[in-house]
């Protein structure tokens, strides 16, 4: 056997094998590798986008949380102001009611004083009439002297 002829035969077989692999085996492998690279790149891009979206969502959540806290603080402040206003209104109403009750009591006391004075005047007038009857030993007509007794009672 000749080594040169074997070597040439092997080289030709190897060339056919390489041509066959380049024609039928290599393109699917390159496509699979390209597809895998594309999927990995897409996955990395999606991960970066998801990371950016997560950061945006966290910023938005923080912003909404801050807004909710501010709104809650505003509502609490508004409720406190309303409570203070209601307390002040209740104080004003209580003061007005107290003043009204005091005024009614004063009017009732004044009325009682006037009633007592009038009753006292009538009693004094009756005593004066009785005293005058005893002094004069005669009956004094109360209706005839009513004006005089009224003047006397008014002076008392």
Curated annotation (Swiss-Prot):
Pfam families named among the record's database cross-references: ATP-synt_B
KW NADP (keyword) present: no
Its membrane topology: Single-pass membrane protein
Any one annotated GO CC term: proton-transporting ATP synthase complex
Main location: membrane
Transmembrane segments: 5-25
Alphabetized GO MF terms: proton-transporting ATP synthase activity, rotational mechanism; proton-transporting ATPase activity, rotational mechanism
Keyword Membrane belongs to the record: yes
Keywords: ATP synthesis, Cell inner membrane, Cell membrane, CF(0), Hydrogen ion transport, Ion transport, Membrane, Transmembrane, Transmembrane helix, Transport
SUPFAM superfamilies: F1F0 ATP synthase subunit B, membrane domain
Subcellular localization(s) per the UniProt record: Cell inner membrane
Family to which the UniProt record says this protein belongs: Belongs to the ATPase B chain family.
PANTHER family: ATP SYNTHASE SUBUNIT B, ATP SYNTHASE SUBUNIT B', CHLOROPLASTIC
Function: F(1)F(0) ATP synthase produces ATP from ADP in the presence of a proton or sodium gradient. F-type ATPases consist of two structural domains, F(1) containing the extramembraneous catalytic core and F(0) containing the membrane proton channel, linked together by a central stalk and a peripheral stalk. During catalysis, ATP synthesis in the catalytic domain of F(1) is coupled via a rotary mechanism of the central stalk subunits to proton translocation. Component of the F(0) channel, it forms part of the peripheral stalk, linking F(1) to F(0).
Record note on quaternary structure: F-type ATPases have 2 components, F(1) - the catalytic core - and F(0) - the membrane proton channel. F(1) has five subunits: alpha(3), beta(3), gamma(1), delta(1), epsilon(1). F(0) has three main subunits: a(1), b(2) and c(10-14). The alpha and beta chains form an alternating ring which encloses part of the gamma chain. F(1) is attached to F(0) by a central stalk formed by the gamma and epsilon chains, while a peripheral stalk is formed by the delta and b chains.
Protein name: ATP synthase subunit b
